Amino acid sequence: MPKYMLIMRGTDESNAAMMASIEEGIATTRLFIEEMLKAGVLLAAEGLDDPGRGVVVHFSGEAPVVTDGPYGETKELFGGYFLLDVASQQEAVEWAKRIPAVTGSKIEVRRVAGEDEMPQDTAGSVEERAGSESTGRI
């Protein structure tokens, strides 16, 4: 079955609303995760730390430049994801509609490209890297 990523996006306002009712949000999210586990569709789920604690590595010239925090012009921030194994985009959308999100949040639904859809040299590079990592030689 295809895999779909449900990408949780929020704004400063929606994140503030979420933090105002964090205990309730955690409880309802746990119930939602249990539903997905019972249905056998959940592969992974993670929430991200505050974007102010992250860094951005920007490739704009000869050497990468590292800056604190998210992009300056970003209005929506990637807050976390659910990775699902479902039959179709429509099924992924139905799960996305059930996410206990606060007003102002958005859920982006994206299919994960299969290995057979990658350019030939990319797929080989992934296999080579996996083999190198298993031996400790990169």
What are these regions, as identified by a protein language model?
Residues M1-I138:
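Conserved, structured core segments of small domains
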